[in-house]
């Protein structure tokens, strides 16, 4: 549904911090998105986390979910960062990690819009690998006009 070129129009992030490779489902009416991140042994964070037992840092799993949620928010508003709007990650609730993400995994990212009040957006997010739960959280973002 969205390749990396279109994703780059909706996310201001760039290598090595762009953590969404493809959007496979985007349902504006249903207010949900499904995307993925292919996790390669060549990711720069594996050099230090951990060299003998590489696992994707949990904070980057959260960031990947937040980026997927950000794409959903931009699409719901029909704006792009180039239009002068950004989303800042400001927090999470009900955060849980279930299993590690390893090199070679495809991290599936799911986000569903919950609410927006005074430019604070909430999304129900979860990540899976091979349909097994990896992480879940309510992601909170602040919408800012530049």
From Swiss-Prot:
**InterPro entries xrefs:** FabA_FabZ, FabZ, HotDog_dom_sf
- Give the enzyme's EC designation: 4.2.1.59
Q: Specify the domain of life of the species encoding this protein.
A: Bacteria
Catalyzed reactions:
a (3R)-hydroxyacyl-[ACP] = a (2E)-enoyl-[ACP] + H2O
The processes (GO biological process) annotated in the record are: fatty acid biosynthetic process; lipid A biosynthetic process
SUPFAM superfamilies in alphabetical order: Thioesterase/thiol ester dehydrase-isomerase
**Main location per UniProt?**
cytoplasm
Record-given protein name: 3-hydroxyacyl-[acyl-carrier-protein] dehydratase FabZ
Q: Which organism is it from?
A: Pseudomonas aeruginosa (strain ATCC 15692 / DSM 22644 / CIP 104116 / JCM 14847 / LMG 12228 / 1C / PRS 101 / PAO1)
Gene name of the record? fabZ
């Amino acid at each position: 549904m969205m390749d990396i070129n279109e994703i780059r129009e909706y996310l201001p992030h760039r290598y090595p911090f762009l953590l969404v490779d493809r959007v496979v489902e985007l349902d504006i009416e249903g207010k949900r998105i499904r995307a993925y991140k292919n996790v390669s042994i060549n990711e720069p964070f594996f050099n230090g986390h951990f060299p003998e037992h590489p696992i994707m840092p949990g904070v980057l799993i959260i960031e990947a979910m937040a980026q997927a949620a950000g794409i959903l928010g931009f699409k719901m508003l029909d704006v792009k960062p180039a239009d002068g709007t950004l989303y800042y990650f400001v927090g999470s609730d009900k955060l849980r990690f279930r299993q590690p993400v390893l090199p070679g995994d495809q991290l599936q990212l799911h986000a569903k819009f919950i609410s927006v009040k005074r430019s604070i957006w909430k999304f129900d997010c979860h990540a899976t690998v091979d349909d097994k739960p990896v992480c879940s959280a309510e992601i909170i973002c602040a919408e800012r006009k530049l």
